[in-house]
A protein has these predicted regions:
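Conserved AdoMet/S-adenosylmethionine-binding subsite of the radical SAM
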Residues: 1-108, 113-114
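A structural motif corresponding to the C-terminal lobe/cap of the Radical SAM core domain
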Residues: 86-89, 97, 113-139, 145
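Acidic carboxylate-rich catalytic motifs and surrounding loops in phosphoryl-/glycosyl-chemistry enzymes
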Residues: 148-151
């Protein structure tokens, strides 16, 4: 940063206050995941409720220079128009103006294998077609936010 480099961090926002306060002030861009607005769905998919994440997200946007919410769009989990309406409202409530729709893919499987962990998303989940991702982009745009597929 001192040498003029732009800095960014990608986070789930599931961390301690100390970590947020130690890192976020020095970052130009925070790319923050949002897997589900529903605490039960989030817990089923990730193993933790999103309550702490939502609180941390509010802290992060107060400290960060810029935040973009990124939605790994997973069929059977959050690939529903209603959920994208809720995500857009969540982004607006935080003062975040940009959402990235990230179509689900299975490229993360190899990371799990390298770490010796089980890939719990399941092999039966298929990648999200681009035209479906475009529907979700249009939902976010309808809330007056910026939105791209990918990012």
């Amino acid at each position: 940063k001192a040498q003029g480099w732009d800095t960014a961090i990608e986070t789930t926002a599931y961390g301690t206050d100390e970590a947020i306060e130690a890192v976020i002030p020095y970052v130009d861009l925070v790319l923050m995941d949002c897997k589900s607005t529903d605490p039960e769905v989030h817990k089923r998919v990730t193993g933790v409720s999103n309550e702490k994440i939502r609180k941390n997200a509010a802290k992060i946007v107060k400290i960060a220079n810029r935040v973009i919410i990124r939605v790994p769009t997973i069929p059977t989990v959050n690939a529903f128009e209603e959920e994208f309406h809720r995500i857009a409202e969540f982004a607006k409530s935080l003062g975040v103006d940009t959402v990235h729709v990230l179509p689900y893919h299975t490229l993360g499987e190899s990371k799990y294998e390298m770490l010796g962990k089980a890939y719990t998303m399941g092999y039966e989940i298929k990648s999200l077609p681009r035209d479906e991702a475009e529907v979700f982009r249009q939902v976010v745009l309808s809330h007056g936010l910026n939105c791209v597929v990918g990012g």
